[in-house]
């Protein structure tokens, strides 16, 4: 449940209850109550209830809890006796006393019992000093808010460098757009100035031959070096010079591009001739391969005929032998 930046822990609640009990004990010691006051008079005991409720409400406020949070445990009988004693005094009312006035007295009086208590935490003294008074509450709230900001910054919720980078990027884009717009205006003005001041191609800003007669307006620009001209004329005139330089270099570029185009055309023609020659040689090779295949087939046929003729020759030899034998037998 959100408490407006304040934390309420169990240790702080226990410490406040112990401190309250010690304060009541010290009040009881400083203001001893007679035996008659502890009798059964209901009028004397009646303020104890509202006083206990007021004390519990003050404790809940010191604990920085919400208004609807549960009240701490009710004090013991000693607290009730102290309530009687304090109600008897005019300056002991809870409305007339401030927590800032009670804390130093209670802290000094509870110094000896606090050293003997084992249940108190080591940081009870700083907590006691910081948890009293609106200034302490304000300082604690600021500390909690700073911790919360640091926690958010560590998780990346707050990313200041990214916003700065975005701002720088937007500034760069705006500067680029402004420069582009200025360049466009400059180029347009340059074209207009050229159209107005250069009616014929003979008059230009380019360095020309000193022997030629030129208007007095351009004599200094003709004799001056290029760096001096660039330093003398503004940016618009510089863009005009660069444009004229590009115009003069355009014929040279055109000539070089025309020679390159001719060279490319010659190379394309040569490549075409080579392709045609390659195609012719490929066809010739295919024809030769076909001829070789036919010759191989003829060789195979001739080899078969040769084998048949050899077989026939062997058969004829055998027949000749048999005929010779028959003739030899007949001649006998």
From Swiss-Prot:
Coiled-coil stretches: 176-198
Region (Leucine-zipper): 292-332
Region feature (Disordered): 1-253
An annotated Gene Ontology molecular function: actin binding
Record-linked InterPro entries: Par-4 (IPR026117)
UniProt keyword terms in alphabetical order: Apoptosis, Coiled coil, Cytoplasm, Nucleus, Phosphoprotein, Transcription, Transcription regulation
Motif B30.2/SPRY domain-binding motif, residue numbers: 61-65
Chain positions with Phosphoserine modification: 223
Modified residues (Phosphothreonine): 155
Top-level division of the source organism's lineage: Eukaryota
Post-translation changes: Preferentially phosphorylated at the Thr-155 by PKC in cancer cells.
Low complexity biased stretches: 65-79
Cell compartment(s), UniProt: Cytoplasm; Nucleus
Amino acid composition bias (Polar residues), ranges on this chain: 1-14, 52-62, 185-195
Motif (Nuclear localization signal): 137-153
Major localisation: cytoplasm
GO biological process: actin filament bundle assembly; apoptotic process; apoptotic signaling pathway; calcium ion import across plasma membrane; cellular response to estradiol stimulus; cellular response to follicle-stimulating hormone stimulus; cellular response to interleukin-1; cellular response to vitamin E
Chain segments carrying region Selective for apoptosis induction in cancer cells (SAC): 137-195
Compositional bias (Basic and acidic residues): 174-184, 234-247
Subunit architecture: Homooligomer. Interacts (via the C-terminal region) with WT1. Interacts with THAP1. Interacts with AATF. Interacts with BACE1. Interacts with SPSB1 (via B30.2/SPRY domain); this interaction is direct and occurs in association with the Elongin BC complex. Interacts with SPSB2 (via B30.2/SPRY domain); this interaction occurs in association with the Elongin BC complex. Interacts with SPSB4 (via B30.2/SPRY domain); this interaction occurs in association with the Elongin BC complex. Component of a ternary complex composed of SQSTM1 and PRKCZ. Interacts with actin.
Record note on domains: The leucine-zipper domain is not essential for apoptosis, but is required for sensitization of cells to exogenous apoptotic insults and for interaction with its partners. The SAC domain is a death-inducing domain selective for apoptosis induction in cancer cells. This domain is essential for nuclear entry, Fas activation, inhibition of NF-kappa-B activity and induction of apoptosis in cancer cells.
Protein's name according to its UniProt entry: PRKC apoptosis WT1 regulator protein
Species annotation: Rattus norvegicus (Rat)
């Amino acid at each position: 449940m959100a408490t407006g930046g304040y934390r309420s822990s169990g240790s702080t609640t226990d410490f406040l209850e112990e401190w309250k009990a010690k304060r009541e004990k010290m009040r009881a010691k400083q203001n001893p109550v007679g035996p008659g006051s502890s009798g059964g008079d209901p009028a004397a005991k009646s303020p104890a209830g509202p006083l206990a409720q007021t004390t519990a409400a003050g404790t809940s406020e010191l604990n920085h809890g919400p208004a609807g949070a549960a009240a701490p445990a009710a004090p013991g009988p000693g607290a009730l006796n102290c309530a009687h004693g304090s109600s008897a005094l005019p300056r002991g009312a809870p409305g007339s006393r401030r927590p800032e006035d009670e804390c130093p007295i209670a802290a000094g009086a509870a110094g000896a019992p606090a050293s003997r208590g084992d249940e108190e935490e080591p940081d009870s003294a700083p907590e006691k000093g910081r948890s009293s008074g609106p200034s302490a509450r304000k300082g604690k709230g600021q500390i909690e808010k700073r911790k919360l900001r640091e926690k958010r910054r560590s998780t990346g919720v707050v990313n200041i460098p990214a916003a700065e980078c975005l701002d720088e990027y937007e500034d760069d884009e705006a500067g680029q757009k402004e420069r582009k717009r200025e360049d466009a205006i400059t180029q347009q003005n340059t074209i207009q100035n050229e159209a107005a001041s250069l009616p014929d191609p003979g008059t230009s800003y380019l360095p020309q031959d000193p022997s030629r007669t030129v208007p007095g307006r351009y004599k200094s620009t003709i004799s001056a070096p290029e760096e001096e001209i660039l330093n003398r004329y503004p940016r618009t005139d510089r863009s005009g010079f660069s444009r004229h330089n590009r115009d003069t270099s355009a014929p040279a570029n055109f000539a070089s591009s025309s020679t390159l185009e001719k060279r490319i055309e010659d190379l394309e023609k040569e490549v075409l001739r080579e392709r045609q020659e390659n195609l012719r040689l490929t066809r010739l090779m295919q024809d030769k391969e076909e001829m070789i295949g036919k010759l191989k087939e003829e060789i195979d046929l001739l080899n078969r005929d040769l084998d048949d003729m050899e077989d026939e020759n062997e058969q004829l030899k055998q027949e000749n032998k048999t005929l010779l034998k028959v003739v030899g037998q007949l001649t006998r």
